[in-house]
Amino acid sequence: MTQATILSHGTMHCFPTGLRDEQDRLVNVEVSAVVYDGQRLILASDKPIPGAERSAVFAMDISDQGIPDDTTLEYFTAGPIARATKYEDFALTADGKYVLATTGFDRIDNESHDLNDYNHLLIWPLGEPDKVKTVDPDPRDGVEGSLELRSKLNAAIGKPYYKIEGLAAIPGKQGDGLLLFGVREQGNAHDDFEYVCRVVGAHYKITADGNLEFVDELRSLYRFDPGQFEGVRHVCGLSSLEYDPFNDRLYLLTSFETEIEGVEHIGGYLWVMALEDFAANKSPALVIDAEGAPLEFEHKAEGLAVLDKARLFVAYDNDRHMGLGDIDERDERYACEAPYTLLEMTS
C-alpha cells in the first residue's frame, strides 16, 4: 500500500489582492494545473487573470522544504500562452526537456473561431516559455488552436462532449514517448454527461524545430471506476495525471463536487500504479493516509506535481468556495490565494 503523510499546508498569492476584471468583478484564482520543472513550480488558473503584464500561467520558486515562494511570482505572457483559455493540466515530456500544457477542449463553435482558445495543446523548451508552439494546429493561416488534435480527440473519445483534465508523458515503445490525455467528463452535451476516469493517448516525437508530432493513432488506453473501491464516498472524475520518473509509476488524481441533502461537498482522492499495470489495464491502488484509511482531500484536488522520489505537491481549485479548513487558521482565503498541500509518499 502507498501511504501519504501531510508535510505541510499553505496558500499562494497568485496576483494582487483585490484585482478586478473589466466588468469590475473580483478575480478568483482557480489553480487547475501544476508541474515542477526541477527549478520552479509552473501553475495555471482555469480562469483568466487580467492585465497585459499577467496571464493565467505563472511560475514561482520553491524552498528545499517544498514551500512555494510567491514573492518570486513570474507570469508567462508569450502570445499563445496568454491566448489559450481554461488550462487544465501540465506535463513534462518523457525526457524532461519540454513543458506541455493542455486546455479543457470542452467547447467549440463550429460556425466561427470564437471558442478556439479553449482548444490548445502547447509545448515549450524547459525554462524558455517565449519559444512556445501550438501542437497540431489548424492548417489554415491565421486560425488559432490545436484543431487537428481536437478532431483526433473526437475520434478517440467517441462522444459529442468531453472535458480533458489530465496530461502526462510516459516512456513508450515508439517515438519519444506516449502522451496521455485524461478525460474527466464525457457525454452528449455540457449539461448531459457522466464523470469518468478515462485515458486516451498516442505515441509522439519531438521535431527538429521543437514541436510535438503524433506518430500513431490517438486511441482509448485505460479506464477505471473509483466507485468500485471501498472507502470512496463520492462520484469522482479524473482531475490530473502525473508521471513519476523517480519511481517509474503513474499518479491519477480524482476530485468530486457533489450536493447531498442541499449541502455541497468537494474533495478528492489520489491513486497510483506501476506503468506495467497501466499497460495491462489493471486497477490503480488508492493511496491511504497515516491511519490506513483512504486519503480524502477536503478540498477539490486539481493539480499534482512530483517534486522528487518521495514528495508530491497538490494544488486545489475550489472554484468559489473560500473556506480554508485545515489549510490555515483563517476561516476564508482571499480570492487571490490558492491553497496547496505537500505530501510525503511511502510504500
Where are these regions (language model features)?
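Sequence/structural signature of beta-propeller domains
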Residues: 1-347
